[in-house]
């Protein structure tokens, strides 16, 4: 029996995304050790908005959005955040990078071969999730974001929930 190359390629294209990318859970969990040795537990942030931001030191759009993202999180009492350094590099390199580009939210290094189970594998960086106070994903962003994007997503989620 002959199997055409096009047929095999077509089958791979249909199957590969299901194998590589998982769905993000409706109410994801996340418990990671931050670079400063503390534990960040998303479940402990219920009642607040949480910005979960996948980034990397080599990602120019990630670096460009960091100051505005940091200022947004620092300015809002109802918002916290976590930066997930999604790269295969030495932990100290990330710490050194952050020494020159500090942020006002904790950072954890994520193993690219074993990322958090409740979040889909990022298809690009930066990837940002806005988690609502009830723990649900209010919005997922692929690419750089601005403060206005987060504010708009928060307003949309609030109006959808009747708050």
Located regions from the model:
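Short active-site neighborhood of thiol/selenol oxidoreductases, capturing the structured segment around
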Residues: 42-60
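Structural microenvironment flanking redox-active thiols in thiol-disulfide oxidoreductases
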Residues: 63-101, 112-117
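Thiol/disulfide oxidoreductase modules built on the thioredoxin-like
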Residues: 99-104, 109-155
């Amino acid at each position: 029996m002959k199997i055409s190359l096009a047929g095999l390629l077509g089958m791979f294209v249909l199957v590969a995304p299901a194998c590589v990318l998982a769905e993000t859970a409706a109410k994801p969990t996340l418990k990671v050790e931050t670079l400063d040795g503390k534990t960040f537990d998303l479940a402990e942030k219920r009642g607040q908005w949480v910005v979960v931001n996948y980034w990397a030191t080599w990602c120019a759009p990630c670096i460009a959005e960091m100051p505005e993202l940091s200022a947004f999180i620092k300015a809002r009492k109802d918002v916290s955040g976590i930066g997930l350094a999604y790269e295969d590099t030495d932990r100290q390199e990330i710490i050194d990078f952050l020494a020159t580009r500090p942020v006002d939210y904790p950072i954890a290094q994520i193993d690219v071969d074993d990322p958090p189970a409740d979040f889909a594998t990022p298809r690009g960086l930066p990837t940002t999730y806005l988690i609502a106070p009830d723990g649900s994903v209010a919005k997922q962003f692929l690419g750089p974001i601005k403060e206005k994007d987060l504010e708009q997503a928060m307003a949309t989620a609030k109006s959808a929930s009747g708050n």
